[in-house]
From Swiss-Prot:
It catalyses: (S)-4-amino-5-oxopentanoate + tRNA(Glu) + NADP(+) = L-glutamyl-tRNA(Glu) + NADPH + H(+). This is Glutamyl-tRNA reductase. The record marks 99 as: Important for activity. Catalyzes the NADPH-dependent reduction of glutamyl-tRNA(Glu) to glutamate 1-semialdehyde (GSA). GO terms for biological process: protoporphyrinogen IX biosynthetic process from glutamate. It comes from Escherichia coli O9:H4 (strain HS). Substrate binds at residues 49-52, 109, 114-116, 120. InterPro entries: 4pyrrol_synth_GluRdtase (IPR000343), 4pyrrol_synth_GluRdtase_dimer (IPR015896), 4pyrrol_synth_GluRdtase_N (IPR015895), GluRdtase_CS (IPR018214), GluRdtase_dimer_dom_sf (IPR036453), GluRdtase_N_sf (IPR036343), NAD(P)-bd_dom_sf (IPR036291), Shikm_DH/Glu-tRNA_Rdtase (IPR006151). The gene is hemA. SUPFAM superfamilies: Glutamyl tRNA-reductase catalytic, N-terminal domain, Glutamyl tRNA-reductase dimerization domain, NAD(P)-binding Rossmann-fold domains.
């Protein structure tokens, strides 16, 4: 049995290839069935995200194994083999285990240390459990990767610092406000960055969010997801006083929030502080707002400096994480090697028990016929000893005849002889 990890990711393949190799969720069961129908495949998990498509497999060794699996992948997606081979990576046993642990821990992600990948790996594993997982070693490898990812998050600072604009904006808000559960947040825009911000805020228990956007329909989709209220851009002036935090990211060529608007809001708030995070380019908030007392304005450049600092911290944490992965990989491979001996141990024990049962039955039969108990017990002990040492004795004799001292020493060690 061999463990494999093969696939492509954002480092090896452009999006034009990644989208062709991806597995759609509605056809994943069909793909897994097709994969497990391959004679060499004992178990499989398919991980397919926007940044990677990977197959994790337990397989029987055979000639042309790599070619057979690449051919299946190309046939399934109707791809040219040469196009795929240039971007494909292939990891086996120790390297496959290490790769999965690194992926689950966020060490192989586009954004170093990002936590979302662990959920994606867990989902891929759960999908494979629906009648597709047949290899206990593969299952154990995934379970181990989950515990390693948790250990990496617990013992290092890999996820402690914001390295995306959206996450940095939320981190800044959490640093300034003791609790986000009691604040009101105004989000201006409804694009991808604001979507991420809204989800981060929801995770941190923000109860009241207002989304202001040019088109109500797009904003409403996000609002329904995070439980927010939707208003028009024209209503910002009137509603601004309600907001403790304003995070803005639109494509407007001109500022949406001016100094006068913020002055009026602060006056209505009796100068309770406001945090304004402007992550738009061009800027959505007039720079003069930052000069107002109790208005704390941060631009995208301010966030980038935070991100750069935090990325350096994550890279340092990643070094610690790699050490954990190396240690855990070594321990898992030791367990795997021990498993390979378990079948031999079971067979050896079964053979010994069969000999014991056979000779014990004969001894009991002799006792029932009135035979001498002491003689029967001595005969049982003698025969049992001879039967159990017969095969090891022959192996020792053969090793001695062959002059194979290494094998002789291994046999002596196995038999507990000094």
């Amino acid at each position: 049995m061999t463990l494999l990890a093969l696939g492509i990711n954002h480092k090896t393949a452009p999006v034009s290839l990644r989208e062709r190799v991806s597995f759609s969720p509605d056809k994943l069961d069909q793909a897994l069935d097709s994969l497990l129908a391959q004679p060499m495949v004992q178990g499989g998990v398919v991980l397919s995200t926007c940044n990677r498509t990977e197959l994790y497999l337990s397989v029987e060794e055979q000639d042309n194994l790599q070619e057979a699996l690449i051919r299946w992948l190309c046939d399934y997606h109707n791809l040219n083999e040469e196009d795929l081979r240039k971007s494909l990576y292939w990891h086996q046993d120790n390297d496959a285990v290490s790769h999965l642990m690194r992926v689950a821990s966020g060490l192989d992600s586009l954004v170093l240390g990002e936590p979302q990948i662990l959920g994606q790996v867990k989902k891929a594993f759960a999908d494979s459990q629906k009648g597709h997982m047949k290899a206990s070693e593969l299952e154990r490898m995934f379970q181990k990767s989950f515990s390693v990812a948790k250990r990496v998050r617990t013992e290092t600072d890999i996820g402690a610092s914001a390295v995306s604009v959206a996450f940095a904006a939320c981190t800044l808000a959490r640093q300034i406000f003791e609790s986000l559960s009691t604040v009101t947040v105004l989000l201006v825009g409804a694009g991808e960055t604001i979507e991420l911000v809204a989800r981060h805020l929801r995770e941190h228990k923000v109860q009241k969010m207002i989304i202001a956007n040019r088109t109500r329909e797009r904003a409403q989709i996000l609002a329904d997801e995070v439980g927010a209220e939707v208003i028009a851009l024209s209503e910002i002036d009137e509603r601004l006083r309600e907001a403790d935090i304003i995070i803005s990211s639109t494509a407007s060529p001109l500022p949406i929030i001016g100094k006068g608007m913020v002055e009026r809001a602060l006056k209505s708030r009796r100068n309770q502080p406001m945090l304004l995070v402007d992550i738009a380019v061009p800027r959505d908030v007039e720079p003069e707002v930052g000069k107002l007392a109790n208005a704390y304005l941060y631009s995208v450049d301010d966030l980038q400096s935070i991100i750069s600092h935090n990325l350096a911290q994550r890279k340092a944490a990643a070094v610690e994480a790699e050490t954990i992965v190396a240690q855990e990989t070594s321990e898992f491979m030791a367990w795997l090697r021990a498993q390979s001996a378990s079948e031999t141990i079971r067979e050896y024990r079964s053979q010994a028990e069969q000999v014991r049962d056979e000779l014990t039955a004969k001894a009991l039969a002799a006792l029932e016929q009135g035979g001498d108990a002491q003689a029967i017990m001595q005969d049982l002990a003698w025969k049992l000893t001879n039967r159990l040492i017969h095969a090891p004795t022959k192996s020792l004799q053969q090793a001695a005849r062959d002059g194979d001292n290494e094998r002789l020493n291994i046999l002596r060690d196995s038999l507990g002889l000094e």
